Amino acid sequence: MSIEIANESGADVDTDAVLAVARHALDEMGVNQLAELSVLLVDIDYMAELNHRWMGGDGPTDVLAFPMDEGSVDHGPGENAAAGAEPALLGDIVLCPEVAAKQAVTAGHSTADELHLLTVHGVLHLLGYDHAEPEEEREMFALQARLLASWRSTRSR
């Protein structure tokens, strides 16, 4: 699995941990091992610009996900890369550490924990999950919590 990360935010971020949680979520979701993903960390001004341009939102947001091959990605237990399978371009996740830091204070955890949560959230969006409706939100957020808990349990060993 190829995961590229670029920190253009100016914030001190443990990019290895962001990569690890993204890889864990993709592995747990059974995503094809040939899949490609990029993660970009940006400053608050650029995130506000992206949010306005692509989502019609005002101001910055915490995470944006831009799927590429949505729908063609294998995900689910036992659906890892088959011989001769083509790489899947999952897409891009854009994170804003400054927004994450503010949300972390409200949530009562570290900025790193918030960035890990947002990374998993972005991965799930790339895999087609959404939270526009209450039932979708329950499903997505429960899966997000499960993936984070399983990742944290692997790190504490």
Curated annotation (Swiss-Prot):
Single strand-specific metallo-endoribonuclease involved in late-stage 70S ribosome quality control and in maturation of the 3' terminus of the 16S rRNA. It comes from Salinispora tropica (strain ATCC BAA-916 / DSM 44818 / JCM 13857 / NBRC 105044 / CNB-440). This is Endoribonuclease YbeY. It is an enzyme of class 3 (hydrolase). Its EC number is 3.1.-.-. Belongs to the endoribonuclease YbeY family. Its main location: cytoplasm. Zn(2+) binds at residues 121, 125, 131. It is found in: Cytoplasm. The keyword Hydrolase applies.
